[in-house]
């Protein structure tokens, strides 16, 4: 069981490091600023939930 878990963690670590080191093709280089901001977008939804609840007085 431990070997399977370590294998899964190792594989996900390899994929994530490859993901962050990947570059866009030259044809899409102008989209680099947008792609840099995209991982932060889910945090905006989390903040929006708190703002929304504050607007309705945390019912």
Curated annotation (Swiss-Prot):
Membrane topology label: Single-pass membrane protein
Main location: plastid
The UniProt record lists the keyword Plastid: yes
One example of a Gene Ontology biological process annotation: photosynthesis
Lineage: superkingdom: Eukaryota
Location in the cell: Plastid, Chloroplast thylakoid membrane
Membrane spanning residue stretches: 38-58
Disulfide cross-links: none
UniProt entry keywords in alphabetical sequence: Chloroplast, Membrane, Photosynthesis, Photosystem II, Plastid, Reaction center, Thylakoid, Transmembrane, Transmembrane helix
Propeptide stretches in the record: 1-22
GO cellular component: chloroplast thylakoid membrane; photosystem II reaction center
Protein family according to the UniProt entry: Belongs to the PsbK family.
Subunit field text: PSII is composed of 1 copy each of membrane proteins PsbA, PsbB, PsbC, PsbD, PsbE, PsbF, PsbH, PsbI, PsbJ, PsbK, PsbL, PsbM, PsbT, PsbX, PsbY, PsbZ, Psb30/Ycf12, at least 3 peripheral proteins of the oxygen-evolving complex and a large number of cofactors. It forms dimeric complexes.
PANTHER family recorded: PHOTOSYSTEM II REACTION CENTER PROTEIN K (PTHR35325:SF1), PTHR35325
Task of the protein: One of the components of the core complex of photosystem II (PSII). PSII is a light-driven water:plastoquinone oxidoreductase that uses light energy to abstract electrons from H(2)O, generating O(2) and a proton gradient subsequently used for ATP formation. It consists of a core antenna complex that captures photons, and an electron transfer chain that converts photonic excitation into a charge separation.
Descriptive protein name: Photosystem II reaction center protein K
